[in-house]
């Protein structure tokens, strides 16, 4: 219900969803908690939080570096503890996880979904799991009332876009371009055709990700028909550039979010 309530409220206000991505535990768990609280108080629509992984193949150099920083002290138990603290801090904001398949399957699929439900998580996106393998997780997601998010890529066939639209809950993660994550000066591709195809199959909101780093990108995404954006690399870069000064980091994050939301 948290995603539904969020999108209904934004629609009434004629606003786009703005969802930031950061890696849990980057640069450490204490700062990570403060970073995410700053995102919430700055007015973001929802959260997309990554579980650090040793081989994040879908990510570019900026987010890869955040995984490596977090991995110095990361653990599943600490991730779950931080998620509980965030849910206690704010009972209303939608919390989504972005994880790699190996982490989930090594933990145990059903156990993982049960655990994150207990932590107050709303959705999961598995970065490196193709749609064809969806049955490996859908039953556990449904059992524990976790919304499973799937990716719609520019190279996908119409059939695959249909599958992504029909099986995604909460929202559909729509890629602005192929390749890996990373901030861009311009949005390289027009995703309007993909978004139009997705909306023909399902009313589930389509969020645009990969390369979102400027307010102009959000305006472009709205013109393409997207319901919101996910922004990761530009935000994680601020963390990377202020590792020696927490206060400066939080102020710059606050300023960045304030400049992106409209």
From Swiss-Prot:
A single cellular component GO annotation: cytosol
Pathway(s) it belongs to: Amino-acid biosynthesis; L-tryptophan biosynthesis; L-tryptophan from chorismate: step 5/5
Signal peptide: none
Disulfide bond residue pairs: none
Top EC class of this enzyme: lyase
Active site, UniProt feature: 48, 59
Superkingdom, natural source: Bacteria
Statement: the UniProt record of this protein carries the keyword tRNA-binding: no
InterPro entries the UniProt entry points to: Aldolase_TIM, RibuloseP-bd_barrel, Trp_synthase_alpha_AS, Trp_synthase_suA
Alphabetized GO MF terms: tryptophan synthase activity
Protein EC: 4.2.1.20
Keywords: Amino-acid biosynthesis, Aromatic amino acid biosynthesis, Lyase, Tryptophan biosynthesis
Catalysis performed (reactions): (1S,2R)-1-C-(indol-3-yl)glycerol 3-phosphate + L-serine = D-glyceraldehyde 3-phosphate + L-tryptophan + H2O
PROSITE patterns hit by this protein: TRP_SYNTHASE_ALPHA
Keyword Lyase part of the UniProt annotation: yes
Subunit structure: Tetramer of two alpha and two beta chains.
Entry similarity comment: Belongs to the TrpA family.
Purpose of the protein: The alpha subunit is responsible for the aldol cleavage of indoleglycerol phosphate to indole and glyceraldehyde 3-phosphate.
Protein's name according to its UniProt entry: Tryptophan synthase alpha chain
Organism of derivation: Helicobacter pylori (strain P12)
Gene name for this UniProt entry: trpA
